Amino acid sequence: MDADLYGYKWARDNVGQSGATIYRLYGKPDAPELFLKHGKGSVANDVTDEMVRLNWLTEFMPLPTIKHFIRTPDDAWLLTTAIPGKTAFQVLEEYPDSGENIVDALAVFLRRLHSIPVCNCPFNGDRVFRLAQAQSRMNNGLVGASDFDDERNGWPVEQVWKEMHKLLPFSPDSVVTHGDFSLDNLIFDEGKLIGCIDVGR
C-alpha cells in the first residue's frame, strides 16, 4: 500500500460517526484523489464489511474503486478512489433552492438500488437482524435519550423501543437498501447524482 500513498497530501475527514478514521489523500500530480479508512477492533469488522459490499455492489451502482485492502486480527485499512463531485449536503448548502431537484435525484437513485434483485444480494440486513443489533446496543448501554429526534427527546430508551415495534409492518417488503442513505453519502457532479459512498451496511 505504501507505493499507492506516496506523494499525496493528507487531510482528516471528520464527517460521519462510523468510528473509523478517514483521510482524504489529494494533491499528487496526475493522480486521482483517494480515501483511506482505518478501523480498529469492532470497527475493523465494519471496514471489512464495506470492502466486501463494495466488491459486490460495484456491478450495479457507481461506487469508489478499491485500490488496496489490508486486514490483521485487530485492524483493517481500506484504500479507495474518491468519486469526483460534492455530497448532496454540500450541494444543498451551496444552492439552498436545489432541494426539490435533490429529492427527485435521490428518489431515482433509491429506486435503482431497490430494483436490484434481492435474490442476488448475499447480505442480510433485514429487520430481524437490525432489531437484534439495536437491542444488543440498548442492553449494553450504548443508546441514550440524547440519540432521539425532537419528538422523542427525553423519552426513556424502553419507551422508544416499544413505540417502534408498534410501527413495524406485518409483512416486510424486502429490497436492497443503503444502510446509511444520507445526504453526506450521496455524490453529485454537474447537477447529477452520480454515486454513493459508505456502503458498509
Where are these regions (language model features)?
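An alpha-helical support segment within catalytic cores of ATP-dependent transferases
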Residues: 1-2, 115-179
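Juxta-kinase regulatory segment immediately upstream of eukaryotic protein kinase catalytic domains
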Residues: 1-10
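A generic structural signal for alpha->beta connector loops
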Residues: 7, 32-33, 60-63, 173, ...
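ATP-binding pocket architecture of kinase catalytic cores
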Residues: 12-123
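Amphipathic, soluble alpha/beta structural segments
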Residues: 14-21, 144-153, 199-201
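Active-site acidic catalytic loop and adjacent metal/ATP-binding pocket
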Residues: 21-26, 160-201
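Active-site donor/metal-binding and catalytic loop motifs
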Residues: 36, 126, 197
